[in-house]
Every structure is written in C-alpha cells, then in structure tokens.
Amino acid sequence: MLDNPLIQQVLFEVMEEDVVGFDVLNVLIDSNEVTDDEISRQLEVKLNNIRRILYKLYEARLVDYNREKDEETNWYTYTWKPSLEKLPALVVKKMKNILDELKKQLSTEENGMFFYCMGCELKFTFEDAMDMGFRCPQCGGVLHEYDNKKDMATIKEQIAYIEDEFNQNPLFFKY
C-alpha cells in the first residue's frame, strides 16, 4: 500500500516532509506493535524525532498507542501500532482538495491572459500587468504576453493522473 504515489504524497505531507517517517511506518508495519524507544534504536534516530513523527501520524489517525505505567519508576511506556485502514479515505480527501485546486487553477489559466518578465521569470495576470504599466516590479523590464498552453497541459496531466489513480486503484473504490 505504501508504494502508491498518491499515498506517499499524502504521507509526506502528514509527516511534514520528514522522510524518516516512512522508515517509522515500515518498522510499525513489520513489528505490528513496538515502543517509540525500540523504533529509535532500530532506526538510529533520536527519540524526540521518532516521537514527533508518531504524534503527526497519530493526529492523522494512522497509528494508535497503548500507555502503560511502570510501577517502579512511575514512567509511562508507549507502545505504538499502525492503524492504516483510514489511510485510503485520508488520501481521497486530500486528493479531492488538490483536484479542486487544480481545476480552479486550470479555469484561471483557460480564462485569463498573462504576462511574463523574461529577466525575473515572473508571471502576472493581465490586470496586474496593466496596473504596473506592463513593467516588471522587480527589474523594470517590459512584460511580454505569456503563452500558457504548456501550463494548462501540465495541469491537465496532473488532473488526469489523480483521476486515473482513483479510477484504477481498488484501494480508493469505496470512497
């Protein structure tokens, strides 16, 4: 399941781009139940980093934990386990938001006129370019009309890719 690109993208976002999170998830899946200290030792990563990742995964409801108190030391031990059955629904929710944004962006690209500064590589709407007298606010260079066909093609490809994943991957069928 973790090899699906959409799932990887969502997990990467959940873990705030911390790639160690994938290693943590793999340890959890392989062990089924493990302490944060054991994960830290196994991956040779600081315990605080492991806990930070686990808390992010817990906030997304992708892991659960049990807490046990050691009567001698009065310290708590947290045993973590994966709870990935909610992952496909989370992916669908986040990807639908991304699809909505991509469709809005595509509509803007299709219905707008844009200008571009070749020196600074900045893109402006017609309205913004007109307000600036068709001059770049950074370098003062002349803004040229921008052909956004490549941008639209890229957005359409992204939309098609996500929709194809939804339609072809059985993980997402019931959502």
Swiss-Prot record:
Pfam families: TFIIE_alpha (PF02002). GO terms for biological process: regulation of DNA-templated transcription; transcription initiation at RNA polymerase II promoter. Keywords: DNA-binding, Transcription, Transcription regulation. One of its GO terms (molecular function) is DNA binding. Residues 3-88 form the HTH TFE/IIEalpha-type domain. InterPro entries: TF_E_archaea, TFE, TFIIE/TFIIEa_HTH, TFIIE_asu, TFIIEa/SarR/Rpc3_HTH_dom, WH-like_DNA-bd_sf, WH_DNA-bd_sf. Signal peptide: none annotated. It comes from the Archaea. The keyword DNA-binding applies. Transcription factor that plays a role in the activation of archaeal genes transcribed by RNA polymerase. Facilitates transcription initiation by enhancing TATA-box recognition by TATA-box-binding protein (Tbp), and transcription factor B (Tfb) and RNA polymerase recruitment. Not absolutely required for transcription in vitro, but particularly important in cases where Tbp or Tfb function is not optimal. It dynamically alters the nucleic acid-binding properties of RNA polymerases by stabilizing the initiation complex and destabilizing elongation complexes. The winged helix domain is involved in binding to DNA in the preinitiation complex. Monomer. Interaction with RNA polymerase subunits RpoF and RpoE is necessary for Tfe stimulatory transcription activity. Able to interact with Tbp and RNA polymerase in the absence of DNA promoter. Interacts both with the preinitiation and elongation complexes. Belongs to the TFE family. This is Transcription factor E. It comes from Methanococcus vannielii (strain ATCC 35089 / DSM 1224 / JCM 13029 / OCM 148 / SB). The lineage of its organism: Archaea, Methanobacteriati, Methanobacteriota, Methanomada group, Methanococci.
